[in-house]
């Protein structure tokens, strides 16, 4: 009996979508001033590198952002809805308790019959989702997977908390992963430390028709910084070792776009020149699960990320969760 050929998951296309409303730091400072909260463009840029963010208008949902990003990724990959046999949406801000956002996207796209489900790992979500899709493709359980990171974090922010409300934006990014005979995703690592839940969480819930707990995002910024740079450094080295490459071999580092301080510190630890780090946090702010696919799409479309190059994508977020995906484009 002939042995079945090994299949790999390769990125065939990408797409991104940002809400039309752009809010600059000056815009945000003016809005917060009406609440007697003081901030400024200088204060925000110095601490985060963020200059603006896109915010969804009231009534715009995560599934709508995800659907538009998905359509753009499908166009880029040249695939039709009937070719998609798996949809995974990474989000912490779903439209509903259920059905899943992925099922809503599937209906919007006119895709039918394939698996559709959500993954919730906060800002690590896209890396978790892509690793999951990669496993299905390698196992022969899927051939064309749509992997989406989409968030409307503006709905869970406490706009009276200057330390968090300036950090986040809304958006969606997507990739199409297709089965291929040559390696695309070379290695992937996922991790979590559930003992660190309180450093970044939104601990609200809906029970018996009422919101219980605190529905807003809360973060210990210093603890998150310390954890993030430590685990991402180790994860990058581990995933490269598994793939048999050196960190120096990486053409592009695309980390979760939390803030520029984390990005720069991580680049220094890994000894990756900043010119080989894709940075979009200045324009998008922190879009949680959407940040990595959005950054990848920007870098592919502006010509920085090219076919054949080695790209390391990393996520880190609440849970505490983190992970890395190393891919040949």
From Swiss-Prot:
Annotated region (ACP-binding), positions in chain: 257-261
State what protein this is by name.
Beta-ketoacyl-[acyl-carrier-protein] synthase III
Q: Which GO terms describe its biological process?
A: fatty acid biosynthetic process; secondary metabolite biosynthetic process
- Family, per the entry? Belongs to the thiolase-like superfamily. FabH family.
Task: Name the enzyme's class.
Answer: transferase
| Location relative to the cell | Cytoplasm
Write the lineage as a comma-separated list: Bacteria, Pseudomonadati, Pseudomonadota, Betaproteobacteria, Burkholderiales
What SUPFAM superfamilies does this protein map onto?
Thiolase-like (SSF53901)
So what EC number does this one have? 2.3.1.180
Its UniProt entry gives the catalysed reaction(s) as: malonyl-[ACP] + acetyl-CoA + H(+) = 3-oxobutanoyl-[ACP] + CO2 + CoA
Gene Ontology cellular component terms for the protein in this record: cytoplasm
* UniProt remark on domains: The last Arg residue of the ACP-binding site is essential for the weak association between ACP/AcpP and FabH.
Q: Where is the active site?
A: 123, 256, 286
Subunit structure comment from the entry = Homodimer.
Q: In which pathway does it act?
A: Lipid metabolism; fatty acid biosynthesis
């Amino acid at each position: 009996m002939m042995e079945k050929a090994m299949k790999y998951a390769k990125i065939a296309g990408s797409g991104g979508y940002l809400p039309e409303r752009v809010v600059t730091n000056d815009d945000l400072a003016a809005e917060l001033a009406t609440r007697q909260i003081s901030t400024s463009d200088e204060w925000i840029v110095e601490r985060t590198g963020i200059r603006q963010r896109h915010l969804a208008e009231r009534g715009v949902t995560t599934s709508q952002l995800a659907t538009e990003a998905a359509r753009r990724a499908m166009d880029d990959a040249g695939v039709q809805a009937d070719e998609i046999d798996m949809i995974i949406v990474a989000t912490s801000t779903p439209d509903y308790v259920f059905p899943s956002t992925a099922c809503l996207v599937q209906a919007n796209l006119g895709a039918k019959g394939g698996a559709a489900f959500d993954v919730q790992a906060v800002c690590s979500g896209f890396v978790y989702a892509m690793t999951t899709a990669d496993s299905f493709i390698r196992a022969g359980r899927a051939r064309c997977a749509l992997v989406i990171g989409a968030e409307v974090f503006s709905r869970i922010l406490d706009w009276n908390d200057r330390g968090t409300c300036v950090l986040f934006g809304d958006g969606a990014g997507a990739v199409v992963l297709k089965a291929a005979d040559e390696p695309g995703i070379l290695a992937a690592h996922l991790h979590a430390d559930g003992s660190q839940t309180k450093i970044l969480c939104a601990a609200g819930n809906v029970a018996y028709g009422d919101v219980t707990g605190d529905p807003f995002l809360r973060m210990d910024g210093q603890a998150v910084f310390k954890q993030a740079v430590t685990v991402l450094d180790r994860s990058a080295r581990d995933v490269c070792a598994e793939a048999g490459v050196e960190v120096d071999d990486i053409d592009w580092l695309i980390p979760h776009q939390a803030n520029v301080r984390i990005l720069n510190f991580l680049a220094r630890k890994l000894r990756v020149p900043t010119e080989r780090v894709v940075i979009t946090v200045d324009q998008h702010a922190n879009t949680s699960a959407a940040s990595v696919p959005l950054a990848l799409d920007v870098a592919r479309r502006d010509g920085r990320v090219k076919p054949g190059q080695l790209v390391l994508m990393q996520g880190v977020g609440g849970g505490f969760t983190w992970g890395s995906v190393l891919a040949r484009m």
